[in-house]
């Protein structure tokens, strides 16, 4: 079941997306935030984290997106593994899903 994020526009606008930047979605889940971030990227990269294997069904087929099926506590390691020293923005939807 797809979850429509609350305050989607406000959350993503707050990142002030650089079309060529590197962004992290630490709570990929249904992919709603990630899809919106990808709409705003040109040549940038988005790395999405989710340790829940159910999230795999929501991974977009997009060369600018990298899915990491692990807890985001490893974000620094995976960021470096993907060839980046730092990110331009991080989104984490830490609310309760109902």
Language-model regions, residue ranges each:
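Long, charge-dense, solvent-exposed interaction surfaces that engage phosphate-rich ligands
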Residues: 85-98
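SAM cofactor-binding core of SAM-dependent methyltransferases
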Residues: 10, 19-80, 91-92
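S-adenosyl-L-methionine
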Residues: 1-20
């Amino acid at each position: 079941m797809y979850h429509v994020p609350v305050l989607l526009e406000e959350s993503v606008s707050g990142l002030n997306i650089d079309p060529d930047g590197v962004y992290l979605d630490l709570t990929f889940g249904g992919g709603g935030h990630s899809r919106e971030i990808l709409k705003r990227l040109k040549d940038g990269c988005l790395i999405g984290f989710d340790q829940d294997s159910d999230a795999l069904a929501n991974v977009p087929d997009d060369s600018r997106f990298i899915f990491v099926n692990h807890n985001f506590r490893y974000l620094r390691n995976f960021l470096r593994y993907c060839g980046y020293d730092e990110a331009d923005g991080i989104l984490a939807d830490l609310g309760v899903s109902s």
